Structures are given as C-alpha cells and as structure tokens.
Amino acid sequence: MLLLDLMSSPSPQLLVAAAQQTLGMGKRRSPPQAICLHLAGEVLAVARGLKPAVLYDCNCAGASELQSYLEELQGLGFLTFGLHILEIGENSLIVSPEHVCQHLEQVLLGTVAFVDVSSCQPHPSVCSLDQLQDLKALVAEIITHLQGLQRDLSLAVSYSRLHSSDWNLCTVFGILLGYPVPYTFHLNQGDDNCLALTPLRVFTARISWLLGQPPILLYSFSVPESLFPGLRDILNTWEKDLRTRFRTQNDFADLSISSEIVTLPAVAL
C-alpha cells in the first residue's frame, strides 16, 4: 500500500504544529491533533485536484489565520503554490482557483442535479440548474471572480471576499465542495426542509494518507433514497471522474466510496 513517504514530506508532528501555532492563537482553542492532520490531508487533496474546496469550520480562525497556516505548510515544502482563501459571508474556504473554475464550468454544463427540499413541499424533488436562473447567474459570477484571481498568483496564498447577503449558502457550499447533487430550498421559507424521516442514501469517499492514521474523509453527502434511481447516472459519472482524478496523483492511496441508508427525525442543512 503506497502511503505518504515520511522521509520526503513533513512529519505528522510538524503538520500538527503548523496548524496549532497559526489557527489556535489568542483565545481560540488549538485544534486537536487528529483534526490538524485531517485538515492537512484535505488541503493537500484540494491542491491535487481531488476536491474543489475545503470549508474550514474547526474553530473561529479567520482568513488571515488560514493564510498564515497555508504559508506555514508551504514553508515546510508541503504544498504546491496557487491555493486561495475565499471568504463568503462569515465562512472561509480553501480553494484551488484553477480546479474550482473547471468544476464550476462543468456545473454550468449540467453535470450536477439539485434536490429541492423546501419545507412547502411534501417530498424532495429534483430540479436542474436551468430551473434556478438566479443560482446559475451566481455560479457564473463566482467563475468570473476566480478567473480574475488566476491572473495574479504573485502572492504565495491569495485572499478575496464575495458578498453573499442574499445567497443560499447551503446550495453554494454544496456546489463549491464538489457535491454531485446539492440541496436547495426557498430562502423565504427559512431553514426548514422536508427531509425529516425521509430515508437518505449517504455517500462517503475516503482516502488513505499517513501511515497509522485514520483515512481522510474526502466527501460526505446524501440524496433522498426515493430519488436515487433517477440520479444514478449523475452519481456514477461523479464517481468515475473522481476515480480518474485519483489515478493522476500519488500522495494518497486506497480510494473507497461507500453508501448507507439512514433516516433521521430532523436534518440540519
């Protein structure tokens, strides 16, 4: 089994120290060791094109702290250059502008489906991006924003902010994180949805990285089981594409994609 060559890459101890020294400063609690190593693996997966973005939600560290963290990793020789901190609302994402633009362009071509889970309807339903014209325009806006950044890669880790006062962040993040079937809902109906007690097929994709450490959770998303037959082609295409990209790198091993059916009394998006 090919795992990270620890002789040519930073040790786990250095990766943990890089996160704790930059993301746990001041009153913020330092992330635990397991979180630090998983975050480093996710960031490397973004740099290698295995996922478009990572949404940072470990503690209250902001964009400047994440910039320091990525620069610390680069100082260790851990990352390729060109990663970007994208701030949307109060949230920070670590993205590769090149890879995320390629992904968003595919989204505009209809490679993903959306599941409307608005609380006003009795059951979830599938809809296309053409039925969500505001969202389609938003995806195009994000592409334009990120393409502008790619012209100036002089900074080791760049940063930008998008204003999002009227965005459905659940849907936007689902797209940016590379989910093949993001959820959407009408914002004027609040955060409620129609997924309570609905059987969901939960997909997870994991990859092995550091010897002796748990695998990296690369993707985790769900689709209503009742809609799964109609979404099978899109999900199969997503899996085939992920396996193809996985074969182009040698930092990770043992890609595992699995699914299980769960039913929950309430689902928070």
UniProtKB/Swiss-Prot annotation:
<protein>
    <recommendedName>
        <fullName>UPF0739 protein C1orf74 homolog</fullName>
    </recommendedName>
</protein>
<dbReference type="Pfam" id="PF14953">
    <property type="entry name" value="DUF4504"/>
</dbReference>
<dbReference type="InterPro" id="IPR027850">
    <property type="entry name" value="DUF4504"/>
</dbReference>
<comment type="similarity">
    <text>Belongs to the UPF0739 family.</text>
</comment>
